[in-house]
Amino acid sequence: MKQLILALDVMDGEKAMEIAKKVAEHVDRIKVNYPLVLSAGVGIMKRLSEIKPVIADFKIADVPYTSSLIARIAFENSAESVIVHGFVGSDTLREVCRVAEEFGGKVYAVTELSSPGGEEFMSAVSLKIVEKAKEAGCHGLIAPSTRIERLREIRKAAGDMEILCPGIGAQKGSIEAVKYADGIIVGRGIYASGNPAEEARKLRRVLKI
């Protein structure tokens, strides 16, 4: 079953909780990033996890030991899964997956960013990242809805790995991404609207998920 994932990139913990409660019946998971965690504290993930499963989008990108510590902090604070940059290489990917396994969590590797800059360096190696992520034991991938031709190639290489796609909404990603993705990540299009719950409901209908 395909999922709608809220990227909750606000910088106020109470506002985040308010939005999460409003949209809870219309989204499947909540993705948090540095803006919220750095402003509200890492404990906000525990609070949000009482509403919906939380993806810690820390885009982990360091040496294996440091990356393992970041992953551990996320899982100890009730994250269901973490996001790691795929370009860090096999050793870091394996170490993050090892920590995830301790907690029964998931790891998603970024293949390429959905922003235009993602094409400058990452597109050239994204299929190699898919290969390394598979070998390391990652559960899934992050791939762009903003470049459908790239998403098609990543889907083909990924096989049955789960793919989550950001970029629909503010970044003008294509709704065609739904064909290739297991989850669609939407942020500003939901939380910055006048009625987040209604916007999330409409998105589910439009995307047929």
From Swiss-Prot:
**Gene3D superfamilies recorded:** Aldolase class I
Question: EC class of this enzyme?
Answer: lyase
Q: Which UniProt keywords apply?
A: Decarboxylase, Lyase, Pyrimidine biosynthesis
Give the CDD domains listed for this entry: OMP_decarboxylase_like (cd04725)
Q: Where is the signal peptide?
A: none
Concerning SMART domains, the annotation shows: OMPdecase (SM00934)
- Annotated active site residues, numbered on this chain, are K59
> What does the entry list as the binding residues for substrate?
9, 31, 57-66, 114, 166-176, 187-188
Q: Write down the chemical reaction(s) this protein catalyses.
A: orotidine 5'-phosphate + H(+) = UMP + CO2
Q: In which pathway does it act?
A: Pyrimidine metabolism; UMP biosynthesis via de novo pathway; UMP from orotate: step 2/2
Sorted alphabetically, the Gene Ontology BP terms of this entry are: 'de novo' pyrimidine nucleobase biosynthetic process; 'de novo' UMP biosynthetic process
UniProt EC number: 4.1.1.23
* This protein's record includes keyword Lyase: yes
Respond yes or no to whether keyword Endoplasmic reticulum is given for this record: no
Q: Give me the Gene Ontology terms describing cellular component.
A: cytosol
Q: Which GO molecular function annotations are given, in alphabetical order?
A: orotidine-5'-phosphate decarboxylase activity
Subunit structure of this chain's protein: Homodimer.
NCBIfam families linked = PRK13813.1 (NF010386), pyrF (TIGR01740)
PANTHER family of this UniProt entry? OROTIDINE 5'-PHOSPHATE DECARBOXYLASE
Provide the function of this protein.
Answer: Catalyzes the decarboxylation of orotidine 5'-monophosphate (OMP) to uridine 5'-monophosphate (UMP).
Q: What family, per the record?
A: Belongs to the OMP decarboxylase family. Type 1 subfamily.
Please give the HAMAP family that the UniProt record associates with this protein: OMPdecase_type1_A (MF_01200_A)
Q: What is this protein called?
A: Orotidine 5'-phosphate decarboxylase
Source species: Archaeoglobus fulgidus (strain ATCC 49558 / DSM 4304 / JCM 9628 / NBRC 100126 / VC-16)
Lineage, top ranks? Archaea, Methanobacteriati, Methanobacteriota, Archaeoglobi, Archaeoglobales
This protein's encoding gene:
pyrF
